[in-house]
Every structure is written in structure tokens, then in C-alpha cells.
Amino acid sequence: MKLSTITTICLSISGAFGTTAIALPTTVALLKNHQQQNTEKQQNPIKDIRFGLNNVQVPNTIPLHQTVVEVTNNKAIVDYKDAPQKFFLAKSALNNKLQVEFDKFLLRTGVINALNADLKEWIDQTLFIPNQSFFDLSANKLNLTLSNQSEVSLDLEFIFTNFSDKNQPLKLPFDGSVVVNANESYTYSVKATLQKLKVLTYSRADHSVGISYAIPTVSLNGKTQNDFSFNPFKSNINFAFKNVYNALNPFEAQQYLVGQGKFLNQKVNADDVKNDINNHIETQFNVAKITATLLGKAFKQFGEHKNGQPLSLLKVLSGLNNEFKQLFNYVRPGLGDFVSDLIQSSSQSSNKKTVYQLLFENKTTIIHLLQDLNISELNSVLPVVDILFEGINSAESLYQRIQSFKDLIVPALKADKQLKSLEAIILAVLDNPNTYVFDLVYQNKSILFNLLSDFLKNTANTLPFLQEQFDIVNHLFANEAIFDLFSNADFVEKIADLFLAKQKVQEVNNDGTKSTKIVDSILVATLKGLVGDQLSSITELLNIYIFENEFLNRNDSNSSVKKQQTDSLKNLFSVIGDILSETNVNKITLHAVKNNELLSLVETASTLKIKHLNVQYKVLVDKFELKNSFIKELLNFFPDTKDITPTIKKVLFESENYKTLRKKYENEGFPGYHWAKFIVPGTFNSAENTFYSAIDKTKSIRDLFADMLFGKSLESVNDSDSFIKINGSFTLKYHGDNLNLLPNYHSLITKNVGYQIVNVNFHIDARLLTAELQNTVFSNPKPVIKSPVELSKSLFEVWKTIFENSVNQILKKEYTFKDNLKFFPFKADGSSRLEFDLSKPDQRVIPFAFVDGYQFQLKKELIPNKETKKEANSSPVLKLYDAVKRNDRQYRPNHHHDDLRNYPSLKSQLELILNLGDKLKANNDFIDDTVVNALQYKTSFKSTLKVNSLGIPINLFFFTLWLKFNLEIPIDGSLTLTSVNVVFPYSLYDTSSNEFTRIVDRLNFTDTNFYLKDAFPNFWFVGF
């Protein structure tokens, strides 16, 4: 939405209710009557001086039309080398440009009438109103001249007449006063020679910069006054900047807010910090538990709803609204009530909430949320939204209030290109007081789909290093079906349609025409994106059982499969509900270990620090269970086709590795038996036939997985038995020395502010946590692949090895990384943590200001080349991790791992990732308060499928010779999660993309790599 459109509507609302805090546009029809009345009053003043009414006539006191300038990076006002086209700016960014722009404005605009209007207000507010009880006011001279639109002279002479019968004090500007005898007069003069008007700034309602002016030197009754202004707090010239704020950027503000005797040091004490840290840990834990049980209840409802009426998502959410309220009140005080009402804003809900009820009952929360979006157009409007609710006491009266402005809103919608796409939705809300949010979402899914697609496209352009992840997200939102989840249809059926069925996607051809393309289901597309090209050795296996599996990639026309999918999903949801049941989740508990130590804050002239921090909690896990039923329900998504012989043939005996091995032995003979090359072909043929004969052709791939995972037949697996039990404990610790405390800004400009602890060590010790398989013995007397091959048993042993390695290499370890511990502006009880006084210039902060020299760009090598094929270990994140670690080793050979603040390599690490702006690079304090983490979690597994003394019959003319061979198939692979992240204390502009700019305080680079080495079977003769 354009600012001009919003401002016209909202400032008109302001005018209608008599608010004068904002200069009003004179073109709005709503104000014409009001202005006419004022003009008539000025032309026909009442003459009875006994009522003390002003009879000073100032001609043509008419404000100018509003002129609002949006500052962009286009050489007109500012021209920054590495900057986005659009940005927020603090006033200091334009300090040396304001006078120039003001002079240009004066030269092109006739402002004399507006100056007269300012003079009229000054006479009223400064001379007349303070003295009206005893004095009449008239003017002998009233000469205000403007030369060349930029120079002004004054010759004003006022006469105050004391109409009382007593001597009275006459109040004069700048706290002066004189006593005037009864029925006598006093002359007051204001004089200034021709001088150039000097620019003067003031804060508008949204704290953006409004322009007033001052006269450099004025004589007030003979006393010289410098920089004199008729109205320093607003001006009828109505000149302002849209995205420039009369506030400090965070780098400027820090010197005024942090340090001995300053705001943060006065407001934050040691007890606050200790309590906030403890509450933070406990809140995060509670949020995790409530989220888990909430999901468990929802999954259970979907899973157990087998027959009858469709069970929609919104019906389930509506039934859980109390749980949602509790959860979101933890996330942000007051948010729970809004979310609870929001999920009931549907015609499907038993306790329906209309859009107007939602707005009326959650006004404050909604405004806070909109502030957090930091959209400049919205922020310019929010300060006057309160006017809309003035005198409103019900949702119905809110609807009537908005109806009174419909004639203003509708033309604005049609005139604004961006708003026009939302016209149908907005008109639906305007026309009907009984509209519901989720009904609007479903009914207007085409509109919202287009907006969402554009948003994802724009966001992807700002995050080039996450292109693969965005490809997956784009696939999810490739058509409007995502919005069907909010309909009254059965939710599980819609999940099957959306995630497990092939999708129809519209594409735009080169000639501009559209065509429909059938693409993989979202699940299969996601799995392909995650797997990539790194599992070539099992490509056939993946194709058969995953990518081409009708249960996971259904053709939309196959309704019989859809029924099976839906039933399987419901069964799966039911067992997930059991895993996340309150009984199971409550086996995980949080206990304070060290949380009551006395904290000490130390301060200097420019800092506030925690001298020593050591807060520890322990999480106890008492036999948290993952049941066999969960694994069994997952296996139901594999095809139940009997006889896996074709699969074994493709995976083992038609693989390139096997063919290479066979060809080698056919040419060279078996080692030590080169003279007997003639038996090699028959040996291999017999080996293959022996494998085939060992396969139970009445069993499916599900049964083979049961052999591997349970060690028993699928039919004998008890659903209620445990598959994995997690037991033990892990500790959480926040610690560090001399930790900086800084403000934490959460929205554009607001009095509510939090604080942050910078560069805190966060330590997780999970060495006492165990995860144990409960099926540890292979006991299936009739496996899928039986003797003499016994491949089922070998697969079972391989699975155990992989699981145990993963637990030891990933779970039972210690992890330490850095973070900024941020506390939001509101406490758990909803009260403000810290409050700025926005009337004080050093407490108005615009945290998202672009500051030239503090921007950055991603290094080009972090952006994958889409034209080249991604190979194992070649992702930019892995290269970045290696570079950061090499940098660590180069600079940090003799330092303890946790002591990061004293390392000289922090700037070097940042420069491996980013091209830093010159001021950012030079600000060592900011660099020291920046976090760089390079973390890698890796589990490797190496095992061997073994078949010993495999008897192979070799037919030799008149008799059969039985030879014995050993077969080994090595399995060697790894799973690696690599993460490099950067955390800034304040938000910076990422200008890596010319078209789309992000404002960020955190960068995350992640890479998941699953690698399976090509298996080369080893097959050798061991005797007769």
C-alpha cells in the first residue's frame, strides 16, 4: 500500500475526530465543512472584548497541501555506493541535506499562506490564549513578507488592552511578563530584517521527520532571539519525509543509552537479569512441552476419526483453543488471546469470532504485531489507529465506524495498484459485519496464492545460498491446494492430496502462454531435493520404493490408492499422538541446578557488563518411548508387492560395481586359482541363483524392513512394545565473563524496549543421555532372505551398528556455541520490561535504520552455481565451515575452546563470510559483540554384510562340484549437518541482491549431507 493512500484515509479519520497532532491534507472532502466554518469565523470575528476574543486578522491563513518525500537511493537526496533502493533512515543521515531540500521546496512552492497560518497559530497560542482572561488583543502592524520564496522579514506590532478594573500581569513569550495597569494598553513588537529561512525538524505522529523552519535572528520587544520559530513542533507548510525518522540509529543511540548514569545502567539491575535468564530457560522448556502435547492431541483426534462427517483442521484447532492460548501467551504475553480468537474466526467454529470481533477485542495486540513487521507504510499509520477506536465499545460500533469511511476507502483501493489485488477481500469485510478470517482465506485462495507466490519469489532472491530449500518451499506452494487445508473438507484427505499426490502446476512458456505440468508429490520432491545426487549406489532402491511408490507419489486419478493413503495417514497420526501424549511428554522434566547465584553488574562510562554468569539446568528424561507401532505404520507406506527378487536383482546383480567385479574375475580368475578361469561364469551364475532361491517369494519389502529393524516377522511385532527408549539426563548452561548488556529493539520506534546479553556461551552436555534399541536379538525363524545367504540377519546387524554409532557420535556429546540472549519488551505478566521516554531525543531509536558503511554483502562464493552439478562436499556451506575452522586453527592454537571474546580472528572470520561496509569493519566494539559459530554434527557408519561359506554348485560335465565362497558387501556412509551462523547485536542491511534487500540480525548457513559410498562386493573362494 502506498503511503499517500494510507495517509489520506487515516489522516482524514484524524481530522474527523478533532485531533490536531498531525497536519491534515486540505484536499479531503471530509474536512471541507470544517475548514469553511473556520474561515467564516475568521472573516466575521465577534467584537465583544468582554469575552476576550481575538480580533487580530491574519489574511489567507490556509495550510498547504501535504508534501511527503520518500528518500530513495537515487542521487536526488542520497547516493550510497552499496545500498538498497529503499530504506529506513535516521535523521542524522540527512542532516547536511535537509536545508538543501527545504530550500528547493520553498523555491517551487508558494508558502506565504502557510506562513500566515503559522503566524495565526502563534498569535493564538502564545499571545492571545495565555492572556485572554484580562486582555484584548489587536494589531497595529502585521507585515510578514517573503522574498524569493526563501527569505522572510517581520514587522509585527501588537496591542494588549487590560479590560479589567485591576492591574494584571501580561504573559509574554519565553516566560517573560509585565504588569499592565487597569484599562491601559501595552505594545509588543516582533521585528526581523530580511533573512533566509532556516530548516527546523520536528517529530510527526509516527516519529518521521516533519519540516518546520526558524528565522535566524528576531527581535522580540527589543530582545534578540536566535532561531526563532512560530511553531517548532509542526508547520502548516506540511512538508515531511516519509521514511526518515526523527530518531537515532542504534549505533548513535548506544553512546547515550549505555554507560554509567545512562538509561540501561539505571533501569537494569542484577536481580532482573538473574530472573530473566531463569524465566527464559523455563519458558523455552514449557513452550516445547506444550507444543508437543498440543500436536499430540491434534494428531490423536485426526487419527481416531475414522468414519462420519469430515474432520476439518479448523474444527480441531477450535477445540484446542485453550491450549493455543496458553502456548502463545508463553511466546508473547497477550498473544494467546489473539491466537485463540483467530483460530475461532471461522464459520466452522462453535464459538465464531467475526473479523470485527477479532479487531475490537485484540486491538492492542494487533498493533504490536503490526509494529513488529516493520513495514514503513504500516508504521506511518499505526500511531493514528487509536483514533479509529475512539469511543468504540463493541464490534458492531466498530463496523459502523468503518462504514462511515467507506466512501474514502473504496476509491483509495481502486487507485492503488498494490491494494487493488486485495480489493475483493477488503470489500467483503466492508460489506458484511459477519465475515470470518478463514472463510475469507478459503474463498479468496487465488488472490492469496498469487501474493504468496510473489512473496516467496522475492524472498528467494534475497537468500541465494538457500536456493535448494526454497525450491522445496515453492513446490509446496505451487498451486492453490495449500489453502484447501482451511476448508471444511476432511483434513487428512487434504493432506494426502497435497503431500502424497502428483501436482498440477501451471507454467508460463517463453511465448507467454500457460501450460499445465504434472510434477512429483511434495513429499517425493522434498526427498529428492534432500538426497540430491549423492546416493547413486541405491538409486534403484529409492526409485522403486520411494520416488515411484504410488503410496507416496499417487496419480491423482487413482482413488483406490487415495483411500489407502488416508487410512495409513490416520493410523500414523494416531501413533504420533501416542508418542506426544501428556503421559509420555511428562517423562521429560526440567530442574534447576545452579540458578540462584548472586550476579554482579559492572559498569564503565560506556558499558554495562555481567561480571560472571553461570546458570545451569538439568533436563531429566525418564524412559521416553518410541513404540513399535510408529515404525510399523511408517512401513505401511511401502508397497506390499510380494517377492523382492526383482529388487535384489537390480540392486545387487545389475549394479555397475557388481558387473565390474564379475568381469575382472572372468578375465583373471579367482585369486590363487587363475588356472581355473573356466569355472568363474558358472560360479557367479550359481551365486546369483543361490541368492534368488534364498528369497521367500511370499514376503514384501515391508517384511525385509521388519527383519532389519525388529529382527522378527512383522506379524509377531507387538505394537505396544518399545522400539527405542530414551533415558538419562542432559544439562543446559549459560555462562561467560564480562558479558555486555545492550538494548534489544523489537519494533520500529516504540517506548517498549528489551535488552540483550551479548556473546553468551550456551553449553549442552548430553553424555549421560542414552537411547537404546529394544530389539537387539534377531529371532525370526522365517526371514525374507533365509539360509544359506542370511541377508536379513546381516541387515539387522548393520542397522544396530549404524544406530549405536549415531547415538555415540551425535547424541552423547557436549556442545558449546555462542548466542545473544534476548529479552523482549514485555514480561510474562504483560508489564513493560523497559520504557523509553519518547519525548527525549536520545530515547527515540530507529533500530532498522540504514547507516551508510554498516551494510554488508554475502561473499560470491557462498552462492551456489545453479549451472553446475552439486558434488559431495562441494556445497558453499561446507567450504565456509572449512575456511572458518582453518581460521580458528591459525589464530587460536593456545586458547580454551569456550573463550571466544579474546580471539583476534573474529573480524577475519566475518570477512570469510561477508564483504563488510567500511564503518562496520572499523567498529571494533561492534565486531567484538558479533557472534560467529561454525558447528558440525557428524555420524559415520561402517559395517559389512557378510555371507560366510556360501555353497555354490558348479556343474562339471558328469558331476556337480560344491565350492564354498565368502561374500562381503561393505556399507560405508555418513550423515553430516554443517552450520555456520552469525549473530549481530543490531540489525544490518544485507545488500547482496540489488533488487531485494533484507534487514537482518542473524545469518544462518546450513547444509545436510548424507553420503553412502558405492559398495564393491568382495567375493572369494575359500575351499570345497
From Swiss-Prot:
Keywords: Cell membrane, Membrane, Transmembrane, Transmembrane helix
Keyword Transmembrane among record annotations: yes
Keyword RNA-binding: no
Subcellular location as annotated: Cell membrane
Principal place of residence: membrane
Protein name, UniProt field: Uncharacterized protein MG075
Domain of life according to the entry: Bacteria
GO cellular component: plasma membrane
Membrane association type: Multi-pass membrane protein
Organism: Mycoplasma genitalium (strain ATCC 33530 / DSM 19775 / NCTC 10195 / G37)
InterPro entries xrefs: MG075-like, P116
Chain ranges passing through the membrane: 11-31, 951-971
Pfam families recorded: P116 (PF23707)
